């Protein structure tokens, strides 16, 4: 399924979003482009091409959408249109030659028209060389773009196979690459702060953001990167849409509601079912407009679902229900604790913790203490593990007090556990 493809491939929708003009005001155009973008990912060129051409009759394509059109026409084995739109894409600012060289959408024209392909890639190289002369750190840009391409290549390979052994092998490679990229990104951030567009270009900055966005295994690093991004707010050195995505990503990773509606929910079948919880959701489009982002109803089309902005009354009702559901689940958990039905305690607290923006840091600590006491009675590892989960979340939020933690005798059996040591040593 295509939406499963989207989930596994990561943030592929935004892989080249830095080429897109943020000044588009025609929502009919934007809706057509969003629908075509989904079809582009499905390789459904028969349905994508009419939508793209209809959009282009309203407004001329920017670099990204000309590039997408070229890919669709290549899949359709329409040589003339494919090269026409590739040429236009380069004229409009496409600068990633390495991505062009490996893009599987262009296999048809690459393999069947070598002379024309050589000419277009030479033009791409020249355009990129001219672009690099305008940058302060062109070599670092090359390094970062290579990291981003490698990241996407291996994820693309994963979705092309259904063999369990190959999937396991590829997942291991993805994990290793993520760790490698994370280590490199940390070094870059420490040395340069958040990289400016004048240093590595829009494409380099976007690829660096993509690596950070994928670093969910190190939320503290994501928070640090976000802090560095914030230093550039209000300048022309930062893509504010990238900022919005990382801000929302960090918020959701800390179990808070997002602000800009960039994060979506996924079903077990890999389908995007809607947006994850948004703070004051009825005001989201105002916040997005301030960053020159498209309305949520248009953005949703990229994922294949329809969306209507709720009213303030609807939001108030939803927030009230979330709070009530959280409190009810916690109350049930405490009742089951009294009757020593510890598995039900676990299930209810786990469900409460899954409500975005539901549990406060104080409630997290209370839950950690309760599960520590259950572990002290049962010695069952799942209870110590979930206690540490709640403590880790508070630590990531910056809401964990070392003195208070060490003075609580319920956690004494945790002292030899590695996760406990990591938390305590970093406070």
Residue ranges and their predicted role:
Residues 1-30, 34-38:
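Bacterial Sec-dependent N-terminal signal peptides
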Residues 28, 35, 68-69, 332, ...:
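Structural register within alpha-helical repeat arrays
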Residues 30, 64-65, 327, 362:
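Start-of-helix register in tetratricopeptide repeats
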Residues 38, 42, 46, 60-62, ...:
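Preference for long, solvent-exposed alpha-helical segments and helix-linker "stalks"
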Residues 39, 73, 336, 371, ...:
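Residue at a conserved register position within TPR or TPR-like alpha-solenoid repeats
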Residues 55, 89, 352-353, 394:
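Canonical positions in the second alpha-helix
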Residues 60, 94, 357-358, 399:
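Short coil turns that delineate tetratricopeptide repeat
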């Amino acid at each position: 399924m295509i939406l499963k493809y989207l989930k596994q491939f990561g943030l592929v929708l935004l892989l080249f979003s830095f080429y897109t003009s943020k000044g588009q005001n025609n929502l009919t155009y934007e809706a057509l482009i969003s629908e075509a973008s989904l079809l582009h990912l499905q390789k459904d060129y028969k349905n994508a091409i009419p939508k793209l051409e209809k959009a282009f009759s309203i407004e001329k394509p920017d670099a990204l959408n000309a590039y997408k059109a070229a890919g669709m026409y290549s899949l359709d084995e329409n040589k003339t249109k494919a090269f026409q739109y590739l040429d236009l894409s380069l004229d409009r600012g496409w600068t990633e030659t390495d991505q062009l060289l490996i893009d599987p959408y262009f296999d048809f024209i690459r393999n069947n028209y070598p002379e024309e392909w050589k000419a277009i890639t030479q033009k791409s190289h020249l355009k990129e060389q001219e672009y690099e002369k305008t940058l302060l750190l062109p070599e670092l840009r090359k390094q970062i773009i290579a990291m981003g391409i490698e990241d996407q290549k291996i994820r693309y390979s994963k979705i092309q196979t259904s063999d369990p052994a190959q999937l396991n092998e590829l997942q291991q490679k993805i994990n290793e690459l993520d760790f490698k990229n994370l280590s490199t990104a940390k070094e870059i951030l420490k040395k340069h702060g958040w990289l400016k567009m004048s240093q590595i270009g829009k494409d380099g900055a976007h690829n660096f953001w993509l690596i950070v966005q994928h670093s969910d295994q190190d939320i503290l690093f994501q928070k640090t990167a976000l802090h560095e991004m914030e230093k550039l707010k209000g300048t022309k050195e930062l893509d504010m849409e990238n900022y919005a995505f990382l801000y929302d990503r960090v918020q959701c990773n800390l179990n808070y509601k997002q602000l800009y509606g960039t994060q979506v929910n996924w079903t077990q079948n890999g389908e995007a079912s809607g947006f994850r919880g948004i703070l004051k959701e009825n005001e989201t489009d105002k916040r997005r407009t301030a960053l020159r982002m498209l309305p949520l109803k248009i953005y949703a089309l990229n994922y294949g679902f329809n969306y209507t902005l709720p009213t303030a009354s609807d939001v108030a009702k939803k927030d009230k229900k979330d709070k009530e559901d959280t409190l009810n689940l916690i109350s049930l958990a405490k009742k089951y604790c009294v009757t020593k039905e510890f598995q039900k305690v676990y299930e209810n607290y786990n469900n409460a913790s899954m409500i975005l923006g539901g549990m406060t840091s104080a409630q997290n600590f209370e839950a950690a203490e309760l599960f520590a006491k259950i572990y002290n009675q049962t010695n069952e590892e799942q209870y110590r593990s979930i206690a540490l989960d709640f403590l880790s979340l508070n630590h990531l939020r910056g809401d964990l007090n070392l003195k208070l933690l060490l003075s609580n005798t319920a956690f004494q059996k945790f002292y030899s556990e590695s996760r406990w040591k990591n938390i305590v040593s970093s406070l």
